[in-house]
Amino acid sequence: MRKLKQYSLLATAIAAVLSNQAIAQDEQAKEQKVETIVVSGTAGGRGIRKIDAGFAVTNIDAVKIDKLAPKSTADLLKAVPGIWVESSGGESGANVFVRGFPGGGDAPFLTVSLQGSPVYPAPTLSFLENSSIFRLDETISMMEALRGGPNPVVSNGQPGLTTNFQLKRGSEDTEGTFKYTTSDYGLQRLDAVLSGELSDDLYYMVGGYIKRSSGIRDAGFTSERGQQFTINLTKELDNGEINVYTRQTDDTGAWYLPTPLNVDGVDAEYTQLGTHNRQAVIYAGNNNAMEIDLGEGRGWKGHISGGSIKLELKNGWHFIDRFNLTQGEANTYGLVPAGGAELLKDVADNGQDAKGSVTGTIYEGDTYVQSMGRWVVLKDIESFTNDLAFSKSFDKWESAYGVYSASTSAQDWWSLGNAAYYVLEAGGEMLDGIECNTSVEGCAWNYDINSTGDAKTLAFYTTQSYRATDALTLDIGLRSERHEVNYSVDENLNGIIEKSVDYSARKTSWTIGADYKLADDMGVFARINKGYKMPYFDDFRDNYGTYEAGNPLIKEVTQAELGYKYMGDNTDFFATLFSNEVKGDTFVRRPGEPAEILTNEALGIEFDYNYNHESGLSVNLNATVQDTEITESPDNEGNESQRQPGWQIRVTPSYDFELAGMFATIYGTFSAVDDRYGNNENTVVLEGYEKFDLGLIVEPAEGLKLQIAADNLTDEQGITEGDPRNVDAPNGRYIMPRSIKFSVSYSF
């Protein structure tokens, strides 16, 4: 395995952290078991004790979320072992990679679920991955993150990572929280949540937020604005419960793009977007002029609504039905680099200087400029999912049978390209005196489309579990899925359909697992599975020639896991050895270019450790060590998978203490990541980096809490990705610069 020395050093560090595990336990602790219940990976989400689960799942509750202070939903996923997240593009548009699975961007192997239902069945469409349409706030009680395991069989059959966010729910007691947050970059945010009982056995939770800021990378105007409102109602019945919810969101933020590397003044705080360039005119289709506001960035305006019915039927049968409806707009506007930094004299018509189109300033020939594409993506999406399951326990046998159905649609209008030269500075303006800046075609390629797509999925699945002995449990799962897609594309906005798809495919996924209990608080598990990532709309457009040649565009994923788990009174420790192979991955550098078809393999181990002591000290550690390889490729066989670190580690210690008669908590996070390659050719190296975060919570009175949190305390200039559209990688995207948030909240 590559980098063996680095891996052994990391393993030594992890072992040192874990060495106090045995010392910290006593006989009384062994009798007090943590009854953590997880619902991810179970048929219909009935739930299972975490210590009994034969798969790797991570729980992050509201308290931990508060301490992690994530800037986006994707940012929270950094706390999940086996996951590499590039969340440096802003609130939306993250890149999420799972356990060495391949990917050139977005989050092709991530499903975000709310109350057990996928928020959108297609994990990734161009300019849309699941986390982009989900916002965190005070209404969330817990997130579960399941990697591999039974994933390919249950729910939407995601073979990679399924995250399930659970809403807070009401009880007989009326409870509430009001929270105000500000920051050193001008954030103004107000959160509120209230819950209680409406009538006998009918409970409510309502909450949401409103926020405004000029952005952590200051654009000079209110580049981030949003509001969200959530209602969750639960009716308890004599033999079950009914739950309904809706989450209404209108939230947009600046889209932070890669910027030139090794140019003075361009760093983690830099954004090209500003008041002098947010408004623009582009030409699309038959050279029709269109006024746009690039300050609208990326966002989500829509709703995620659904519910569930859970019933205890006669003869020991259980019934659960979970459903979800998502509708809205997920639009994207941005200044996308169309090349590297250049000197003005090399592109100016007169070879000397040029004039600013807004201010009239004359810029000299040694001024840095850059060609920027003014990209517009308008996307209307809708989906409805339903997951129905029956289950029953027979002595040593547990059986479940389910039906999952999904209807997914997307209507897209794009105008990509529209490039012009801008002064390379924060808010830098477009220039007069460069011929292509005023031409209809612009200074680089253009790609415009109008498309519509509908997909339907119908799957039948079953899971069977047999308790062979008091210690050994065996399980098996099967899923038969039919996937249909109808899709058409007008690629020139001229009313002519250039690409049309009428697609149908059926696949059978499976999982086999064994769980062995070493003691009441300790066990091991083994599992193998095979699943599939079915194609959606953009897969056909990007790979149309490959599809016409008979390739079904289905990614086949085979995984194996071997895990150890321990859950004591104050210590949890999970270690999972994983191996996977992904066949049929396609990578397209830019729309219209040929697809590269790959097979990727990965071997690694992930650690998830939590320690909580009565002294007030707690520690969370998650780490991943992996070796990836492209095993089949026309040109890159034997190389490492792009943008996949060989190792990463994240340690979050916390200490509770009294300060002048007040309860206080000091906490921090240290994270480090290995070098990565920015491309499949392995010619672009993205250097590893370390990052420190620090926070303090003080509770001066009952219900009152003050919190200050510093992110990237040392202002590390780490790079998360290169330039996926340029093989020379003259640009890169920095992690977010140092920022400080302060909040005050009152709970009752």
Which residues does each predicted region cover?
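N-terminal periplasmic accessory domains that precede
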Residues: 73-76, 95-97, 112-113, 130-133, ...
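Short acidic/polar hinge/loop motifs at secondary-structure boundaries
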Residues: 118-147
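N-terminal periplasmic "start-of-domain" segments of outer-membrane beta-barrel proteins
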Residues: 35-68, 93-95
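C-terminal beta-signal and adjacent terminal beta-strands/loops
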Residues: 671-679, 697-748
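Gram-negative outer-membrane beta-barrel transporters
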Residues: 469, 572, 577-582, 588, ...
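Extracytoplasmic beta-strand/coil segments of soluble accessory domains associated
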Residues: 49, 74-118
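Acidic/polar loop-and-plug regions of large Gram-negative outer-membrane beta-barrel proteins
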Residues: 230, 234-236, 241-308, 331-375, ...
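Transmembrane beta-barrel wall of Gram-negative outer-membrane proteins
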Residues: 175-177, 181-267, 297-300, 304-313, ...
